């Protein structure tokens, strides 16, 4: 993949389950290094789209290219290589409840490589620290953690193999406003420090205004618009207007404006 080439390129995608068509003629590009937020109403198929991109779905038509490779026709060897370049944080965290945080991260590390256990443990601690968790969280079980810490533990696991792209499904769902804001800043910091590309599904307007370079609106079975927020929030379509120009959208815009005004010059 060239530096200026789309990491994800989707053309003419159709996803359907029986007679129900979820997506029809959907196009989307995701550029290297960007944080793109995907929004849409309930039932618009945001998670279905994510699963199709990472090879967990079976689209009825269209093309999905990930790192320049056609997802549907990858060999098993190529698919394994591509999977190692993708970190995924599912909505429920999906940690193994019988394993400690460090052991959860270690599972991802040892799935593809035979590594000395001592090195695996040190790498797991590094990923746990990267995710903003205190090191004493390493020996705790998921049930002993708060909701925000579970999210961070799952994020540490998704970072285990040094991915190029992070897929996040509703990363701030269930977090209080302070926890959600801290998680947003963590994603921004990781993108900047590790050179990640981030594809996130969210309904959190504050997340969109705080960290997303572009927003893609999924409605009417396709991506209606994918652009910067100032373009998207003025897009002439009823759902988009209700979402961005309603009371919550206005509040998020005001909060983003206050935050921007409080930043030191040059940031």
What is each stretch, according to the model?
Residues 54:
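Helix-to-loop junction immediately C-terminal to a conserved catalytic motif
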Residues 70, 118-136:
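Conserved ABC ATPase "signature" region
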Residues 162:
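Conserved catalytic motifs of ABC-family nucleotide-binding domains
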């Amino acid at each position: 993949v060239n530096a200026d080439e789309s990491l994800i390129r989707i053309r003419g995608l159709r996803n359907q389950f029986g007679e129900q068509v979820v997506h029809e003629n959907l196009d989307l590009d995701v550029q290297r290094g960007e944080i793109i937020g995907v929004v849409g109403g309930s039932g618009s198929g945001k998670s279905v789209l994510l699963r199709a991109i990472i090879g967990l779905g079976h689209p009825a038509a269209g093309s999905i290219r990930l790192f320049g490779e056609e997802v549907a026709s990858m060999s098993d060897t190529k698919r394994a290589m591509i999977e190692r370049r993708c970190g995924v944080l599912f909505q429920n965290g999906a940690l193994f409840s019988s394993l400690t945080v460090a052991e959860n991260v270690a599972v991802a590390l040892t799935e593809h490589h035979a590594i000395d256990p001592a090195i695996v443990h040190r790498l797991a601690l590094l990923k746990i620290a990267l995710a903003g968790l205190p090191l004493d969280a390493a020996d705790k079980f998921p049930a002993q953690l708060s909701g925000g810490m579970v999210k961070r533990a799952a994020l540490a696991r998704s970072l285990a193999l040094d991915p190029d792209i992070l897929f996040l499904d509703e990363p701030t769902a269930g977090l209080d406003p302070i926890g959600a804001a801290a998680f947003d800043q963590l994603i921004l910091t990781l993108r900047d420090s590790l050179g990640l590309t981030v594809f996130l599904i969210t309904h959190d307007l504050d997340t969109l205004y705080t960290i997303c370079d572009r927003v893609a609106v999924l409605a009417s079975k396709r991506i209606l618009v994918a652009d910067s927020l100032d373009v998207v929030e003025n897009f002439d379509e009823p759902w988009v207007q209700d979402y961005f120009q309603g009371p919550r959208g206005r509040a998020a815009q005001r909060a983003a404006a206050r935050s921007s005004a409080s930043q030191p010059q040059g940031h």
